Amino acid sequence: MTTPRSIGAIVTAALAAGLIAMPQSATADTSAADGVRVHDLQGATRLSPLAGQAVTAVPGIVTGVRTYGSSKGFWLQDPTPDADPATSEGVFVFTSSAPTVAVGDSVTVSGTVSEFYPGGKAAGDQSVTEITKPVVTVVSSGNALPAPVVLNSAAVPAAYVPAGDPAAGNSIEALPLRPAAYALDLYESLEGMNVQVADTRVVGATDPYSELWVTVRPEDNPSARGGTVYGSYANQNSGRLQIQSLVPTAQQPFPTANVGDVLTGTTEGPLDYNQFGGYTLTARTLGTVASHGLQPETTRKQRKDELAVATYNVENLDPSDPQAKFDRLAAGVVTHLASPDIVALEEIQDNNGAVNDGTVAADQTLNKFIDAIVAAGGPRYQWRSIDPTNGTDGGEPGGNIRQAFLFNAARVSFTDRPGGDATTPVWVSSNHGRAALSVSPGRIAPGDSAWADSRKPLAGEFSFRGKPVIVIANHFASKGGDAPLTSRVQPVVRSSETKRLQQSVQVNTFVRQIQAVQKDARVVVLGDINDYEFSAAGLRLTEGRALKDLALSLRPSERYSYVYQGNSQVLDHILVSPSLGTPDYDVVHINAEFADQASDHDPQVARIRP
């Protein structure tokens, strides 16, 4: 331990700001004036027993400093822990402005104990115990840091979280922590403490916010390409952990990593919690990325007698996007999807994107995309879509996202039946015993409350080698508003699922109406369902054996089209009627696992012999 450092001008400024007080002695003092230590104010539940109370001269060592963002401050850890594994020895000290302490300082902190809910209490997140309105006394500098707690398979339980207390609205906040039993209890018992991971596999690629995800339990549900598959509400992947850096990116660029890469060496820093991923290792020291060599996939070309039907969410595409985005998306269609016969697109925006001036037409968006496909060596697709009523289909304000069909007229024809518009519902009729759409393209039940502020399904009738095929393109309601997996209420409240369940009922009912007219009708339902193959909405689509979800034809390790918070998961689906058998099906991984993406979704294709 060193003698106190010369504080000089830094302390003068900090004194003026009320963030720091002059040392009272020349040696590090680990005794609290009022007897309160960090583990006392943290307590053995998720809520501090001292919340709202003032504390005086809480001692500890500074283990991390955050000088950027809206949550500036530092982490304080007591080098003399108690014997209770449920009580954290670390705490965040919120200073509001850039703190002037340094890592390794021995300090005492006086202030108010608070519980901060990232994103606001209504968001459902757990709280972070903090000391606010602090007065900080630097006692000495250059002290050794408390040894990090190593997070690995042996330390982190497979079980994720206990069920909440029914008497408290299923809240877990007041439950005694059981860090040996549940991963979220372990992480909470380490909140604010110095932790370490070593040689960890990346399961969520570096994002635009300089974050990535690793797993400290690589044996849990591995994907075929190095990720971690989310396959059940009851079986969470407890080893997922978000990594951020305490070093501003202007000083040290954040590493670029793809799924399957390894963050080699040690990554160490305080364990934080935020609304963008829950428990987060805020690294003082970052490991080095070792590439796994992940490459974008390419599917095979359809055979002459195979109808290739694909779906691709192109993430808010509009003409103002850089040409490079159009070119990359086009390469996805031509090179990686092998130019399918029909492509259902989601998130096509209107001709001026997010400019909210009443524009709803998207012909410029679609034609620019088709031109890019031709330039990439693909066919000059034709397109069909229906412009929505302005501002009624959700998505980015002003963008008026909708689904659209691209089709290769050299291989497949579209059966046009006029009259389809934003508000006219399509219905099923019989044409000499064959199911036919009243309008094509048409929208399913656009006036139903299930589709309020959401994209209406787009139905179209195609013909391939003389055989009619009805295709329904979907983009169900988003998961916005759902509580996070780390929510303080368990089981997690998935409020958005109600809307998607209603939408599934609508689509399933429409398909069954088709089959009531023609039992062996050829029907493809596809798109961004925004829900999992095991979800209530996903299962409801298949009710009555009206459809088969092709995701279930894949091995569990291959079932994903999207990566979120380190979970590789199914959001995009292709479902087919029983008359189409079991098509050759491929989710083509070109985006979701990569730091450099053309879209946040992977496309997929089914090759069908009608």
Predicted feature locations:
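A broad structural signal for short, well-ordered beta-strand segments within beta-sheet-rich domains
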Residues: 24, 131, 202, 414-415, ...
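Divalent cation-coordinating acidic motifs and surrounding scaffolds
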Residues: 276, 280-610
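Secretory targeting and sorting signals
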Residues: 1-29
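Extended non-catalytic accessory segments flanking core domains
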Residues: 29-308, 312, 316-339, 425-429, ...
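Short, functionally important structural connectors and interaction interfaces within domains
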Residues: 7, 12-14, 33, 255, ...
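Secondary-structure junction/capping motif
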Residues: 3, 34-40, 364-368, 548-549
